UniProtKB/Swiss-Prot annotation:
Native species: Bifidobacterium adolescentis (strain ATCC 15703 / DSM 20083 / NCTC 11814 / E194a)
Residue intervals of the Radical SAM core domain: 129-372
CDD domains assigned: Radical_SAM (cd01335)
Positions contributing to S-adenosyl-L-methionine binding: 198-199, 232, 255-257, 334
Functional description taken from the UniProt entry: Specifically methylates position 2 of adenine 2503 in 23S rRNA and position 2 of adenine 37 in tRNAs.
Designated gene of the protein: rlmN
Name used for this protein in its record: Probable dual-specificity RNA methyltransferase RlmN
Binding-site positions, [4Fe-4S] cluster: 143, 147, 150
């Protein structure tokens, strides 16, 4: 496996040109410590052999990690006492360290700021609902997509995250739910959305490895159904097509935000590389391959993309491909510090939804959890609080 951070795709220069980010460039400034979640089975067995441990100990470690969310030596009760610390240090180096934890919505929304091995900061958001618990996770440090209304997009891309760094966000949240650390008592982490910091398709190899580990049953993974995992993208077409070939029934979410190329060029710089037709073609092909409805994410911005003409054009573009293949999630824009972009008027939000519904498009206005702790969509900026 050895899924250490690979290359990504990021805007380059002021002309809108794009380039691949090489591993020696700023997207990979150093490798995190190799973690159990980064290793192939052969690498795990090899590491165990170096420690003088028999092969069957690897399966025991997998059961501890994926089945019980344990990484601490004292929890390895089935290991010889003298070997527990060695095993924990070799297989489970600390990849993410909690810096701050902010709580909102009566304790049912928790935003955590994490420090990585190199001092980089990322965030994840855990949201408990009556019938499910969703974790929004990061896949890159920062983001190179440059969307002007998104706090993460203003950071630029520092580097890709390893599979281990991604998976650890899930393990810690799953353990917190099991241990009753979230308001509502003990429960189960049920849904994962790759909608935190970063463009998941720009870190494809690590994200795919994480998806496999999240969705596989213990002791190979956490056992969260692939159907409850959402992978988002601003429209990196090669990534969408590659994901369709994997045969993993995750939901695809496309951050469209505009129905025309003229407007989307301004809101989503990646549109200069992959235009709306290319993105929607790929998204529809993903629907055909996966039999999963695609989510179309659409941040509503006052006077920019929230008028009747925009809703009508969006409906026309989606209906071009047929019925019931996409579900639109209009999202009230979440404010970010110093931004000129503001949320739509409630009456414009209602009219936008009504037009989509009348055109036969399924659409649901997105619940904006964690806005008061800058934990909602587009607000993750990984800042330490004063």
């Amino acid at each position: 496996m050895n899924d250490q951070p690979e290359t990504g795709i990021t805007p380059g220069g002021t002309s809108g040109a794009f380039r691949d980010v090489l591993s020696k460039d700023h997207a990979r400034r150093g490798k995190p410590p190799l973690h159990f979640a980064d290793m192939s089975e052969e690498e795990r067995i090899g590491k165990a052999k170096e420690l003088g441990l028999p092969k069957f100990r690897v399966k025991q470690l997998a059961n501890h990690y994926y089945g019980h969310f344990d990484v601490n030596a004292e929890e390895f009760s089935d290991f010889p006492a003298a070997r527990r610390s060695d095993a924990a240090e070799a297989f489970f180096p600390e990849l993410i360290h909690e810096v701050t934890r902010q709580v909102a919505d009566g304790g049912t929304t928790i935003k955590t700021l994490w420090r990585l091995f190199d001092g980089s900061l990322i965030e994840s958001v855990l949201m408990r609902y009556p019938t499910r618990t969703t974790l929004c996770i990061s896949s890159q440090v920062g983001c190179g997509m440059g969307c002007p209304f998104c706090a993460t997009g203003q950071l630029g891309l520092t580097r890709n995250m390893s599979a281990g760094e991604i998976v650890e966000q899930v393990r810690v949240a799953a353990k917190a739910m099991r241990d009753g650390e979230v308001a509502g008592g003990s429960g189960r982490l049920s849904n994962i959305v790759f909608m935190g910091m970063g463009e998941p398709m720009g870190n494809y190899k690590s994200v795919l490895s994480a998806v496999r580990q999240i969705s596989s049953m213990p002791p190979e993974g956490f056992g969260i159904s692939a159907r409850n995992i959402t992978v988002s993208t601003v429209g990196v077409v090669p990534g969408i097509r590659k994901l369709a070939e994997e045969g993993i029934p995750v939901r695809l979410a496309v951050s469209l935000h505009a129905p025309s190329d003229e407007l989307r060029d301004e809101l989503v710089p990646m549109n200069k590389r992959f235009n709306t037709k290319q993105v929607l073609d790929a998204a529809h092909d993903y629907y055909l391959a996966s039999k999963r409805r695609v989510s179309i994410e659409y941040a509503l911005m006052r006077g920019i993309n929230d008028q009747a003409e925009h809703a009508k054009l969006l409906a026309k573009r989606l209906n071009h491909y047929g019925d019931d293949w996409a579900h639109v999630n209009p999202i009230p824009l979440n404010p970010i510090e110093g931004s000129k972009w503001t949320a739509s008027k409630p009456e414009d939000e209602r009219r936008f939804l009504e037009i989509l519904h009348n055109a036969g498009i399924t659409a649901t206005l997105r619940d904006t959890r964690g806005q008061d702790i800058d934990g909602a969509c587009g607000q993750l900026a990984a800042k330490e609080r004063d």
